[in-house]
Amino acid sequence: MGGQNRATTTLEERRPRRADAARNFDALVAAGREAFAEDGSGASLEDIARRAGVGIGTLYRNFPTRDDLIETLYLREVAALADAADEVADLPPRQAFEAWLDRFVEYVGTKHVLLDGLNRESTVFAECRGVMLGAGEPLLRRAQEDGAVKADVAIADVVKLIAGVSAVAYDDEEQRRRVLGLAIGSLRS
């Protein structure tokens, strides 16, 4: 927690400096997020450019390949997850950890669409995993030190548990919250 994470740094390195180019970049990222959420990893790049209000050449100037756009979207999600750890850090330990887990559930919802199109061998994927685990680890440790979470729980296990529970199809939102509550409850001391 505290300070800039690697995902944010990588995003800043990718984002153009000129104001008009930065606006186009941001519009493409927002349009890409919408299109991938609606159409999956096979979303049309032409549609993304149209939604962003730019030409296809501008899209390719910013993102030479589909993978480049997907990696940037994934970096944004991971950076937001890391930022969420900082945002909840001042809450009581258990509340902070569980608030971050709620944000992690939101992240899992966008992650599946992006991971379908992401090259899992890329360095970005490996770095993002480290950023994500690094964001949750201090919150977990504080909750463990406070006696709110079992001492033998590891952040990598928590991430797998919550990701698995979040990926299942539920009858309704109430059932999803109940099952997620059971999973989080299983971590408590």
Question: Which residues fall in each region the model found?
Answer:
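C-terminal peripheral helix-coil segments that are non-catalytic and often amphipathic
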Residues: 1-12, 99, 138-148, 164, ...
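Basic, helix-initiating cap at the start of DNA-binding domains
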Residues: 1-42, 46-51, 68
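Short hydrophobic/aromatic patch on the recognition helix
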Residues: 53-63
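Alpha-helical DNA-contacting segments of helix-turn-helix folds
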Residues: 63, 70-77
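A secondary-structure capping/hinge motif
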Residues: 67-69, 113
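Hydrophobic alpha-helical connector segments
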Residues: 72, 82-109, 124, 131-133
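Helical hydrophobic small-molecule/effector-binding pocket
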Residues: 90-117, 145-152, 170-174
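Short linear capping/connector segments at secondary-structure termini
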Residues: 116-124
